[in-house]
Amino acid sequence: MAIKAETTFSLKDQLFNATSLRKLSDALDQTKLRYQRKKFEKEILDAFPNLELKARIDWMVTVLAGYLPDEFEVAIEILENALPSPLDPKKTDDDFGEFIWAVPGEYVARFGCTDLHLESSLDFLRKSTMRFTAENSIRPFLRRYPEETMRFIRRCATDNNYHVRRLASEGIRPFLPWAVRANVEPEQIFEVLEIRNEKASIIKSEKGTQFC
């Protein structure tokens, strides 16, 4: 009698595990942050078996915050220096980065959505979305600072980088998996899409490429 092997695919285990966490730790090692790496990784990984996918991201942000400086501007400077090389700016929607790089953006969404840090936080998300989409991280800013964030979104829609333009369109989609709803008026969405598409057409015409 043949024994049937049972396999269960786990997206959370594929995306967030010891291997992916090491990529974040390796990057932090290259910054001025001085921290206990083994303790940092153990604290995160010990909790993973009891956490679902989004909860794992939230937990990594919580643990990371305990190792970063209390001063937000210093902390995001470290995170910016830890970011990997930008994604290919010519790639299309099937390329939005490795999920471990959601952590820096979510850190900024949790701790930087304030009057004091609004400008630097949005600037960070523009940079981080070139590594992993910040479409989820931008949403707390849309809810708390709708006017300022929509101005930022419109600027992103005209950016030369595909991934930044993608943030403009995906960040204001009403619904995304695991994300809070984006309360953006339909006419604002259409306006951003029109700006984005116009910019993409200009780039396509200038570069003679289909990847816009």
List PLM regions with ranges:
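Surface-facing alpha-helical segments and adjacent helix-coil boundary elements at the starts of domains
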Residues: 1-212
